[in-house]
Amino acid sequence: MEIYQFHNLPFCPKPNDGSGLYEAMLEAKDEGKIKHIGITSHKFTIAKQALSSGLYETLQFPFSYLTDAQELNLVEKCKKLDVGFLAMKAMGGGLITNSKAAYAFMANYDNVLPIWGIQRESELDEFISYQENP
């Protein structure tokens, strides 16, 4: 498995925190079962802890053109630390209706992989057209 991400836990797993979660992932990595350890969160404090820990290779966090300065700083910090950033809620959880504007915003961040949440083939066609005709 390329990436194993802890998903939206109420804390940031770390070695010796008593949960055994991070140790289990290190063991899986040592055994070649996973290549990278990541984390997802909806909470800024947990995302910040994950980056500060130096333990995670990816961070999945809400990010869109509705984002604020502290979230932009997360993206910049990920780039500096060479941590992959996966943007969940790239369409603002349904608040953004202009997919072209959302795509143009994301195109400004070469270290961000957006998760578009495509539900229909027509939506997929829209995003493919933006890629083919920037």
Model-derived features with residue positions:
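Active-site gating/metal-coordination segments in enzymes
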Residues: 1-5
